Amino acid sequence: MADVLSVGVNLEAFSQAISAIQALRSSVSRVFDCLKDGMRNKETLEGREKAFIAHFQDNLHSVNRDLNELERLSNLVGKPSENHPLHNSGLLSLDPVQDKTPLYSQLLQAYKWSNKLQYHAGLASGLLNQQSLKRSANQMGVSAKRRPKAQPTTLVLPPQYVDDVISRIDRMFPEMSIHLSRPNGTSAMLLVTLGKVLKVIVVMRSLFIDRTIVKGYNENVYTEDGKLDIWSKSNYQVFQKVTDHATTALLHYQLPQMPDVVVRSFMTWLRSYIKLFQAPCQRCGKFLQDGLPPTWRDFRTLEAFHDTCRQ
């Protein structure tokens, strides 16, 4: 290391220059001490002035002498060679200004976004691997030529079993009334009334929930011929939102081997809307956002969230 530093540098002159710097600092300090002390130790004013001027001139001459000596030695020191390696310290001058090139913040944001995308993709992959998109008990990935064509088990349950499951669910929730009808044969249709908050039309095939429509408590749910209206939407945006969330819940609660558990889980989730207009958002703490109450209910905790706060 010493050999690298000594290239092109007179070390003896360098040492003398350091001593000259110290001498120059001492001379400058004496000048300021002289100015600070002022005129002293003389009886007459004229004598004090002459002594002060003489002492001040001597100090200035000392400063001038030491400065000339330092300039002379600085010429003898020489310049270090520019070829010695700086290693990583040579890259310090290449660092960009944070205000002009916010590269770090952009990379950090991209990294967080990529992490979040990977996390949600993993969750979606796990759910899709567990649940068949056909909502049947058939195994996925088997060639259609090799497996027999089986009827899904959820579509061949006897009506008595379906009635018994719905009756038990109706008794589980006192604030929820369920009216079952079969206007088109064996397929059941449910009219679920949740307190005085809303009504839900549930179209079923055996114990498989095919469609849900949520409407307000005072809205008409029947057509002109007295049948349940399974096509028209609610006139209120809040219940249209709840209908969309209920459709999402149908895709979430899927277990083809245990269809009664699926229906009970969906009804438990639907029951959480009993406080649709009373529960605040668990994230922002507000009751209204864009004129709407918290319409989303978490599938596990059943906590209320606004549609924009749940993400």
Swiss-Prot record:
Tagged with keyword Translocase: no
UniProt family annotation: Belongs to the Mediator complex subunit 27 family.
Known partners and oligomeric status: Component of the Mediator complex, which is composed of MED1, MED4, MED6, MED7, MED8, MED9, MED10, MED11, MED12, MED13, MED13L, MED14, MED15, MED16, MED17, MED18, MED19, MED20, MED21, MED22, MED23, MED24, MED25, MED26, MED27, MED29, MED30, MED31, CCNC, CDK8 and CDC2L6/CDK11. The MED12, MED13, CCNC and CDK8 subunits form a distinct module termed the CDK8 module. Mediator containing the CDK8 module is less active than Mediator lacking this module in supporting transcriptional activation.
Task performed by this protein: Component of the Mediator complex, a coactivator involved in the regulated transcription of nearly all RNA polymerase II-dependent genes. Mediator functions as a bridge to convey information from gene-specific regulatory proteins to the basal RNA polymerase II transcription machinery. Mediator is recruited to promoters by direct interactions with regulatory proteins and serves as a scaffold for the assembly of a functional preinitiation complex with RNA polymerase II and the general transcription factors.
GO annotation, biological process: regulation of transcription by RNA polymerase II; somatic stem cell population maintenance
In-chain residues carrying the UniProt-annotated modification N6-methyllysine: 134
Modified residues (Phosphoserine): 132
Disulfide feature: none
Protein name: Mediator of RNA polymerase II transcription subunit 27
Organism: Sus scrofa (Pig)
Pfam families recorded: Med27
Compartment(s) where it occurs, according to its Swiss-Prot or TrEMBL record: Nucleus
Keywords (A to Z) from UniProt: Activator, Methylation, Nucleus, Phosphoprotein, Transcription, Transcription regulation
Keyword presence, Membrane: no
